[in-house]
Amino acid sequence: MNKIDFIEMEQMKKNIPVFRPGDTVKVHVKIVEGDKSRIQVFQGVVIGRQNGGIRESFTVRKISNGIGVERSFPLHSPSVDAIEVITRGQVRRAKLYYLRKLRGKASRIKEKKYVAGM
């Protein structure tokens, strides 16, 4: 392992939940306004993950007042306070960019079923 990899491993967050495209997540983001800071929650569907390691980022899409809003977050950024997985989605693609064209009920994602006790 070289020095760059060692420095990157030190800066990576350890408490990141496992999530994939299609999952509905809540992202708690720190927002600094002047000398005050607050946490804002952005809830939506993960439509893609990009890169890997310290540079990894993910894109979340939600519908707000009938308008689609997408926001990209660096996974290991200090401004991302927490990530909560709300539901697991069952999809067959790594990038869900086709959701941008769909409206209403057509943009729903099938939920994964889990069998308890196995």
Swiss-Prot record:
Gene name of the encoded protein: rplS
Claim: Ribonucleoprotein is one of the keywords in the record: yes
Protein name (database record): Large ribosomal subunit protein bL19
Keywords: Ribonucleoprotein, Ribosomal protein
GO CC terms of this entry: cytosolic large ribosomal subunit
PANTHER family reported for this sequence: LARGE RIBOSOMAL SUBUNIT PROTEIN BL19M, RIBOSOMAL PROTEIN L19
Free-text function comment from the UniProt entry: This protein is located at the 30S-50S ribosomal subunit interface and may play a role in the structure and function of the aminoacyl-tRNA binding site.
HAMAP family listed in its UniProt record: Ribosomal_bL19
GO biological process: translation
Organism listed in the record: Geotalea uraniireducens (strain Rf4)
Family (UniProt): Belongs to the bacterial ribosomal protein bL19 family.
Matching NCBIfam families: rplS_bact
GO terms of molecular function: structural constituent of ribosome
